[in-house]
Every structure is written in C-alpha cells, then in structure tokens.
Amino acid sequence: MSRLQRTATVSLVVLAVLLLGAAKYPARGAGHAPPAKPATCQRSAFRAVVDVGHTVEVPGAISARGVAEYAFNLQLADAVKQALVAAGFDRTVRLVTATAPPKGLIERAALANKMHADLFISIHHDSVPDYLLETWQYEEQQYQFSDRFQGYAVFISHDNADRAGSLQFGRLLGKALQARGLQYTPHYTLPLMGNRRRELIDAAAGVYRYNQLIVLRNTRMPACCSRPDRSSTGRRSWNWRARNAASSSARPSCPRSRIFAWRG
C-alpha cells in the first residue's frame, strides 16, 4: 500500500468521523448558530475505536503477492488512528487482540463497550470466493488473484444497539468514498455468492447489511466494517483468498467471501 493510497483512505475516514462527531457532540453554542453555519465537534470528548481485523496467529487472507491481510489491516488502522489524533480526536484507540476467533471478536466488542466508545470502525480487506481465483507467478512463487470484481464495501449490522447511528456513519463513509470517485462493489448481491450474499441497503453509499458480524452486532455504539479497495484490476491488485477452509463458519465476522484490496 503506497503512502498516497493510505492517505486517501484515512482522509475519508477522518471526514466521516468529523461529520458524525459534529452531530453527536456539537460545540457549545452551536445549537444557537445560524442554520447556514455547520456545527463543530467537541473532538476531545469523542472516542473512536479503530479495530484491527484478524490477529498474528489468524492473519486472514493472503494477497496476490503473498502478504497476510492482517498486515494491511494493521497498517491502515495505525494510519487512521494517527490521523484522528492529529485532527484532535485524542481519545482514539487502536484495538488489537491476540485471542483467536470467535472468542477474540467477542472480547474486542466488550472492550469497546467498556471504553464507552462513540464509534467503532473495524478495518478489513477483501477477496472473492476460492472458486473465482486464478493462479499467477510472482517472484518465482505462485499466488492466487481475481480480476472479476472491484470496489469498496461498508458493512453494518441491524443487530447493533445503535442501528440508526451505524447506518448514518456507514452512509457518511460510503458517500465520502464515492465523492472521491470510488465505487462500491456490487458482487455481494449476486447469486454466485451463495449464502454469502448480502442485502444492499444503500446503493448511493455502498452500505450492506450483515447482521452476524460479531464486532458490529455486540457493540453498543455506532459500528461499521470498512472494506476499502482501490479501483484497479489485473495481477497488480491485492486480491485476497481465505487461508482456512473453516473460516466462514468459525469466524462469522470475518467471512471468506471478500473482495480485494491494495495493488502494488
């Protein structure tokens, strides 16, 4: 992931957090301001939790060039946290656990609840089902990739305690991505996804409903799973495949059917 790619994604997340924070914690006197003047946010009072998907021991999928998904999740989560702190959100926490799923997922949601967080963002990168993958050679090693789909996705759970807030933030993030010329991936709606099909609840923002995501379902604050992608195709795409055959059943919040992420 290049610095430019990371910066673009981080800026969009920060923008969405700012917008949500302004709605949740308007500055003193903002309620008496003229209607045309946007509310500002008490950033020091707003706590965002940036959740790193997967663990060192269960690193998720493998990219088209042999890099574990966890490495990308950690890199992006670090950048998001740093940018939020730099923007004045001093209470931002990057959440990492070593416990294997599903117990680790439950622990992460419980930690966010204990912190009384205002927002929960889970960072993941995606791939397609295994049967859609092709093989190619990179640096004398064989890896798998897929050119079939591209785009980002935002997941929310209707079982989250703040369903309306989750949808609000998901829409803010998705629309910010679209404003930068990115498109959401439609492949989650297709029959080829089988039992991994998801309901598209906001086509304008690329927001999908996935009620079973543990870290979204068990948190008590607005929560979404951000699955960023760059609009690229070909073997330069960072396309993911699942490492474990049982991952879809053992890790309901980390499905095997993912898209793809960063190109090299």
Residue ranges and their predicted role:
Residues S2-G264:
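Catalytic-site microenvironment of enzymes
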